[in-house]
Amino acid sequence: MPKMKTKSSAKKRFKFLGNGKVKRTHSHLRHILTKKTTKQKRNLRGTAIISSTDVKRVRAMMPTQ
């Protein structure tokens, strides 16, 4: 049976934390930024934690993690 492969898209988007949670970056911060307020852009900086309902789905895409 062949090896299970990690989805490249998931590998680039998600990071696993030591406590089992999954970290992701916010979207909407690449272009068309002039119409967004400074507050909107500031709140999109940094990372967010994926909801517990989606963690199982992300783990299925990354079997080696």
UniProtKB/Swiss-Prot annotation:
- Annotated keywords: Ribonucleoprotein, Ribosomal protein
InterPro entries in UniProt:
Ribosomal_bL35, Ribosomal_bL35-like, Ribosomal_bL35_CS, Ribosomal_bL35_sf
Biological processes annotated in GO? translation
Residues in coiled coil: none
Keyword hit for Ribosomal protein: yes
Which molecular function GO terms apply here? structural constituent of ribosome
On the tree of life, the source organism's domain of life is: Bacteria
Q: Which GO terms describe its cellular component?
A: cytosolic large ribosomal subunit
Any Pfam family hit: Ribosomal_L35p
* Similarity-based family: Belongs to the bacterial ribosomal protein bL35 family.
Q: What protein am I looking at?
A: Large ribosomal subunit protein bL35
| Protein species of origin | Methylobacillus flagellatus (strain ATCC 51484 / DSM 6875 / VKM B-1610 / KT)
